[in-house]
Structure formats: C-alpha cells, structure tokens
Amino acid sequence: MFSGLTLNCVLLLLQLLLARSLENAYVFEVGKNAYLPCSYTLSTPGALVPMCWGKGFCPWSQCTNELLRTDERNVTYQKSSRYQLKGDLNKGDVSLIIKNVTLDDHGTYCCRIQFPGLMNDKKLELKLDIKAAKVTPAQTAHGDSTTASPRTLTTERNGSETQTLVTLHNNNGTKISTWADEIKDSGETIRTAIHIGVGVSAGLTLALIIGVLILKWYSCKKKKLSSLSLITLANLPPGGLANAGAVRIRSEENIYTIEENVYEVENSNEYYCYVNSQQPS
C-alpha cells in the first residue's frame, strides 16, 4: 500500500512538472494570417468548455498575457480584432487566427481548455515564428527574371534593430550587389577614420609632452646657472671687487706707459743720426 501511494505521488509530481505539452512550431510570413490549431473532444454533445488564449507559456491557471477568452459558447474577451476564433465552437474547435502578423508576433502561445475539476485543464503550447516576406521576381529589360532571397540582419545601434537583407540573382547566376556591400564599405571607412584620428591625437599628445619636458629642462638649467653666479659673488672677500677694479686700472696705465716709451726711443734715434751727419769727412 505504501509503495502504491509513493507511485501515485511520483506520477502526480511528474504531471505537475511535465504538464506542458511539446511545443509545435508554426512559421508564417510578415503580413499573412497566422493559424494556431487547438481543439478538444466534447464528453457529450453540447457540453462546451471555457477556454483562453494567451501569449507566453501556460501558467498554473488561466492564461498569461491573455489575448482571447470564451465561456461555454461565446467570446467574452478579445484583446484586439486581430485575434479571432474561426473554428466551430460547438464541435470544440477553438483554433486561433492572428491577422496581418508582424515580427513582434513571434513567440510562444498557450491554448488552455478549462475542464472541470482540479488539475484537469488541457494545455497546449505552440511556437509561432515570423519570417520576412519574399520579394517577387522582377522582369529585366532583356527578359531575364531576377529572384530575390531575403535574409534577416540584426544590428545593434542604440538597441536591437532587425532589417531585411535582399540578395538578387539573375538567370545567368550573376549576383547583384545590394546595400550590404555599402554597409560593409562604410563600416571599413569609419574604422579607418577612427584609427587615423587616434594616431594623430596620440602623435600630437606625444609632441606636446616632449615640448613641455624641454621647456621645463631649460627653465631648470637657467635657474641653476643663476644660482651658481649668485653663490660665486657671495663667496668673494670684502675687498675682492675693489682689488679687481684696481688691477684693471693698473693694467690700462701700463699699456699707456709702454706706448710712450716706444715713442721716445724712436725720437732719440732720429736725433743721433742727425748729429753724425754734421761731422766732416
């Protein structure tokens, strides 16, 4: 008996943990109407059951982010006219139609059939994927048809942004360039400009630093020479300046005396020669 009770507890726990059914993925193009099937079997004819549709995983009760709700026979809540039930409610068909889908409609949807009793609800989770619309073939001037295959390109610039990239091919297999090449070229140009700007800024900064260091070194050297001159003058004896001036004056007088002596010697020689010339032969 104890083992049977344990087995029942384990089964109940598994039911609680694995109550969600496997997700079924449905893919639709942008602008189309999406169809998400959901139905249940009536226990007896006319025994309809309330249900709800929500966006997100099925919670423990009701529907998260409720989109549509019914009682036994009628729709009692509808978030938008885009969400409609097109099946036969009297036969248990509660499939959801989403009109004119966009990329924001992708995600998981919950269909909850609220059968009477505890833990008796039927929960069905369906995954909706939205892809970009295909571009129709265009006829060229020479009669060659051109096909386009769209791809989704995600870029991050002040947030997440999704764009459609179209690559064109003609019958000859020639690829027609699209704006993807322009984006690539512009990106390389921007990176090159950034690198050049960083290099120029670094060079100017280095030159400025070197100039400041040179000016600082020159200023320090000039101050050092001025300090040495002041120290030399301060170490001279009290009469040193006067003695230096006197020595300079005496040197100038000696120069004048030497010049006068030379002049007198030249005059005496001339006189001697003149006297000798007066003697008889």
Swiss-Prot record:
**Phosphotyrosine PTM positions:** Y256
Annotated GO biological process: adaptive immune response; cellular response to lipopolysaccharide; defense response to Gram-positive bacterium; inflammatory response; innate immune response; macrophage activation involved in immune response; maternal process involved in female pregnancy; natural killer cell tolerance induction
Stretch list, region Disordered = 139-160
Give me the residues that bind a 1,2-diacyl-sn-glycero-3-phospho-L-serine, please: S61, Q62, R112, M119
Q: Which consequence is recorded for altering Y256F?
A: Abolishes phosphorylation, disrupts interaction with PIK3R1 and PIK3R2, no LGALS9-mediated disruption of interaction with BAG6
Q: List the disulfide bonds.
A: C38-C111, C52-C63, C58-C110
> Is Metal-binding set as a keyword in this record?
yes
Give binding positions for Ca(2+). Answer: F115, G117, N120
- SUPFAM superfamilies from the UniProt entry: Immunoglobulin
Task: State which residue ranges cross the membrane.
Answer: 194-214
Entry's family note? Belongs to the immunoglobulin superfamily. TIM family.
Q: What name appears for this protein in its UniProt entry?
A: Hepatitis A virus cellular receptor 2 homolog
UniProt organism field: Mus musculus
Gene behind the chain: Havcr2
